[in-house]
Amino acid sequence: MTDHRVEFVDVASMAQWIQRDGVGNIIAGMVNFLEEDFKKWQSFDKIPRVASHTPFGVIELMPTSDNITYSFKYVNGHPSNPARGYQTVTAFGLLTDVDNGYPVFLAEMTLLTALRTAAVSAMVAKHLARKDSRKMAMIGTGSQSEFQALGMRAVLGIEDLAVYDVDPAAIEKFRRNLEPLGFRIHAASSVDEAVADADIITTCTADKQQAKVLLNSQVKPGVHLNAIGGDCPGKTELESEI
């Protein structure tokens, strides 16, 4: 019987890669790969994510194949986890050989999920936002918001941010982490204030209880909307009129 080895990338290895190459550089590189994948979208064998919803959160499986390899990602989303000392999101992924069904690659994907989410946002903004976009409003300043900011700067050159969160401590953490990297950050006291001069509005929230983060009246013509928190029932973020 043929010997078989499954390659494995753990949390430490993923962190070393990010530290070596930098979040912005990684996201910019991901955008190139994602653009090629979206061009081949119709050729992938795929189904919508399989989700299990509970009062605590959601656990999802995301399978796809190109008939050469098959892969899936496991990811959860539990908004109340930080209060209990856990991460909101954890993830891992498996790649297999379609020819023999053997797994060939297993990877920790919690950090990779954060990078990929930001890369998709940056890729879409690259093609749909106005080319002269220079200011972004960020509604919700949890951990993903920092990846969003770094990705938008790497791909679009945006460094002026107006941010709002219902938790002042989250805003302060965002500023503490990103201002030393050269971002110009205005801590707004309301959503209205944050979006007033925005070319791009990113909503980046996790709590199902806040179903309407952004109202139609707050969106000016020509603004690009990047709503990434509305990923399951009850998390719409945008008013229906939008």
Identify the residue ranges that each predicted region occupies.
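N-terminal ligand-binding/catalytic initiation module
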Residues: 1-114, 122, 132
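Short helix-loop-beta connector
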Residues: 128-135, 157, 220-221
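Glycine-rich Rossmann-fold phosphate-binding loop(s) that bind the pyrophosphate
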Residues: 141-142
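NAD(P)-binding Rossmann-fold cofactor-contacting core
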Residues: 155-179
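Short acidic low-complexity segments
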Residues: 183-198, 214
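Rossmann-fold NAD(P) dinucleotide-binding segment
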Residues: 197, 208-224
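Short glycine-/small-residue-rich Rossmann-like dinucleotide-binding loops
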Residues: 205-207, 229-230
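Rossmann-fold NAD(P)-binding glycine/threonine-rich loop
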Residues: 218-219, 228-242
